[in-house]
Amino acid sequence: MKIRTAAGPASAELDAAADPPFLLVLTHGAGGGTDSADLMAARQAGLDQGAAVARVVQPYRLRGARAPGSAARQDEAWLEIVAKLRRRFPGVPLIQGGRSNGARVACRTARAAGALAVLALAFPLHPPGRPERSRAAELAQAGTEVLVVNGAADPFGVPEAAGAIRVVVLPGTAHALAGQGGAIRRLVGSWLALLVRGDDPPEPPGGLRPGSSVTGPGPSVPPSRGVGRDLG
């Protein structure tokens, strides 16, 4: 489906359940698409929970550009996209996320969008080799539950867990999270189940809790109750 925004048209691939418990909206990295293995794993995790899942191609990518340009303009367009998707599913909680640059957008706009939680795959903490240019503030800006899944060898860095931000570090992989589809599906599925239904999954390695992190895929990631050329 096409979605008009002030920045131009976007498109969304929508898997819509009849009576979904939540809406999961996902988007790509700076120069990527919505069919990356990690986004497809997150999509399947949402479908496993009965969600409506939208994978959004942002306006700049639909125009053929590989760099998103102004963050403010990108965020404005994202909020228009999410608002129009939410009108199709009134009263349903929103969980939004993405990979790399898409994860940044999801964090920056979470409050304004009214998101219950954010999924950040391969969050680019800093440009490669430039740790002084940290984007950790964007994670905190979400103001809600955030699940970060990063590769241990990611040249864009690995965020620290803090507050409502959980971080899972997958060994043996970098920014693409290659070969981790199964682990991502399990992690995201357990996280979504607890967020939306309050299911109590088994304890993950390291006893992951709010403001903590764990290395390895683990069986689950429980949040607190109550609630290349990918440019980053």
Feature map (PLM): residue ranges:
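Short beta-strand/loop motif that positions the catalytic acidic residue
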Residues: 142, 148-150
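Serine-hydrolase catalytic machinery in alpha/beta-hydrolase-like enzymes
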Residues: 2-93, 105
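Gly/Ala-rich beta-loop-alpha elbow adjacent to hydrolase catalytic centers
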Residues: 98-102, 106
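Catalytic active-site module of serine/aspartate enzymes centered on a nucleophile-bearing elbow/loop
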Residues: 181-212, 216, 228, 232
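Active-site nucleophile loop of the alpha/beta-hydrolase fold
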Residues: 58, 120-128, 151
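Catalytic histidine-centered segment of alpha/beta-hydrolase-like enzymes
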Residues: 173-183
